[in-house]
Amino acid sequence: MKQGRIDETGRLTEPYYFTSRVFLNQRDIRELQLAKAAIAAGIQILCQKKGIRTEDIERVLIAGAFGNYLDSASACAIGMLPSALLDRITSIGNAAGEGARIAAVNREQFERSKALAEKTEFVELALDVEFQEVYVDEMGFPEEEEHGE
């Protein structure tokens, strides 16, 4: 986007080849838009349901391979994650595996995990009408001057 090859709607303005066999195409951009919109809309709707602002979020932990390879600044620049949270984003690797290992060897941590699971609320975003509306709104990319906000 910084190079002007992708507009704010996600349209690839010209082909982009990294090498003769590795290139970026419109389908790649669309897949990114779908993921970006889902994450951005999910954050907005969950904050709305809890009655908080994104600025109130203390930490953002990104787990798994996604977190290992995610560049936080780029995720904020494209609107996937709120820019206000940039300095609070941490990649934590294989959180599920590490949590299972800790719970397996530490009874106290196992009990804490159970208590946390019992008070965790499941939200079915895919069935939420507001989520669908925000999801569609989040498909585009911020214009260049919005990246730093």
Model-derived segments and their meaning:
Residues 1-149:
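Helical "lid/coupling" subdomains associated with nucleotide-phosphate turnover
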